[in-house]
């Protein structure tokens, strides 16, 4: 019986690049919507403070870490998880600074998933 190990079924079968991409999008949708509360969405914005302390860097890092975990599960790659962490934090930081619109933010995230799926699918 096959079992999952880091995004690849271990029974002689592997996922196609499109299947990896689909799992990456599912992970993104789950991490960016039901797993991101309204409080997290506000608290990860640059400049957010709580009781006089700037907590936004740690909240943004936690949010990016959840996304990195989803990438690790979908691809089995720690390298891609690390790249996702950096990219996701950078994209969300840019959005928080007003450099990206909502649609631009989501397009950048999906673009990263295309790159990760391509890398994982051909590695």
Model-derived features: where do they sit?
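Helix-coil boundary and interhelical linker segments in multi-pass alpha-helical membrane proteins
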Residues: 2-22, 68-80, 115-123
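Interhelical loop and helix-boundary elements at the membrane-water interface
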Residues: 23-67, 85, 89-121
């Amino acid at each position: 019986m096959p079992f999952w190990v880091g995004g690849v079924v271990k029974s002689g079968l592997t996922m196609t690049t499109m299947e990896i991409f689909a799992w990456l999008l599912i992970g993104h949708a789950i991490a960016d919507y039901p797993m991101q509360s309204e409080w997290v969405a506000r608290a990860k914005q640059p400049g957010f403070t709580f009781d006089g302390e700037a907590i936004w860097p740690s909240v943004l890092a936690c949010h990016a870490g959840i996304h990195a975990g989803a990438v690790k599960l979908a691809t089995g790659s720690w390298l891609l998880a690390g790249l996702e962490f950096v990219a996701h934090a950078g994209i969300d930081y840019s959005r928080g600074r007003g450099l990206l619109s909502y649609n631009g933010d989501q397009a950048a995230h999906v673009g990263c998933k295309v790159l990760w799926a391509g890398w994982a699918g051909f590695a």
